[in-house]
Amino acid sequence: MHAGLPTMTTPQDIIRRDVLAMTSYPVPDASGFVKLDAMENPYPLPEPLAAALGERLARVALNRYPAPRPAALLDKLRHAMGVPGTCDVLLGNGSDEIISMISVACAKPGAKVLAPVPGFVMYELSARFAQLDFVGVPLKADLTLDVDAMLAAIAEHRPAIVYLAYPNNPTGTLYDDADIERILRAATHSLIVIDEAYQPFAQHSWLPRAGEFDNVVVMRTVSKLGLAGIRLGYLVGRPAWLNEFDKVRPPYNINVLTQATADFLLDHLDVLDAQAAELRAERARLAQAVAALPGATVFPSAGNFLLVRVPDAAAVFDALLTERVLVKNVSKMHPLLAECVRLTVGSPDENARLLAALKLALPD
């Protein structure tokens, strides 16, 4: 350093200490693997539909900013998804952005976020980013909702936000409707966010009832339906809530290509629904086959994935990697997930390769 020059500022001088202590969200390189780690729909669009979409996208004005609230798309979404008349719709760049908007808008000093654990990691991460306290309420040993513990935690902590994933990720659990209603009735001082990211595979929904409760919003994404690449989530709830969240939404958060793709494919939901039906059938076949393997315990799932407990999760994960099959080792995420791996339900060919690899990893 030259004499007389001031000491330069470093990131450590400026960045929050809790951020410095974090690590980036890990996303493994899946090149050359059968990719069964991220709950994606394995099916591409049929070729004629993909070609028609390509022609539509070629006409999009890339030189113009996107509409901040695309009225035609929102109306089409309301109609296609059966949004109650008393509710509005807010779009996000994936449900992750919606979670972030909710966290930022509700980040009063001392406010808390509460959710069952293990659950979707972004509930806690987004809370931490917004400097909200996160309270995790463990599921029961069978990975069902501990409703009494939830009610006690709500009474103790009076959280600003309560997340209920319906069904839950990574467990696949579809919480009992009566238990959810007990939580809704008890958490009168909280915003309840019902996360229905996997609704196409659960075939159960609280969205039709979103307008019945003053403090309930329902969140969905098109990712699991087969459109993970366009990053589009939406929130349904009373305008009084959504108008406030809209204030912290980046003004051009949904790009023109995403808007055009969603508008086009909402006219072809029958294709995506048929793919979801095929994946539900594959889920049943895969669950039965995996459960027959030595040492494997398959938990009931209402998502497009299976949570499986094996004798040694790390060894199974590595053995599958050797066979060029990528799954998710969730065994370190929470004590209730000890020795568990999460398997995305793929196409019949992908599932056959997964089963062949699992048979090598779990010999008799």
Swiss-Prot record:
Positions of post-translational N6-(pyridoxal phosphate)lysine modification: K224
NCBIfam families: hisC
Recorded superkingdom: Bacteria
Recorded catalytic activity of this chain's protein: L-histidinol phosphate + 2-oxoglutarate = 3-(imidazol-4-yl)-2-oxopropyl phosphate + L-glutamate
EC code(s) of this entry: 2.6.1.9
Family: Belongs to the class-II pyridoxal-phosphate-dependent aminotransferase family. Histidinol-phosphate aminotransferase subfamily.
InterPro entries: Aminotransferase_I/II_large, HisP_aminotrans, PyrdxlP-dep_Trfase, PyrdxlP-dep_Trfase_major, PyrdxlP-dep_Trfase_small
Gene Ontology MF terms: histidinol-phosphate transaminase activity; pyridoxal phosphate binding
Cofactor: pyridoxal 5'-phosphate
Pathway the protein takes part in: Amino-acid biosynthesis; L-histidine biosynthesis; L-histidine from 5-phospho-alpha-D-ribose 1-diphosphate: step 7/9
Keywords: Amino-acid biosynthesis, Aminotransferase, Histidine biosynthesis, Pyridoxal phosphate, Transferase
Record-given protein name: Histidinol-phosphate aminotransferase
Biological processes, Gene Ontology terms: L-histidine biosynthetic process
HAMAP family: HisC_aminotrans_2 (MF_01023)
Subunit structure: Homodimer.
The organism of origin for this protein: Burkholderia multivorans (strain ATCC 17616 / 249)
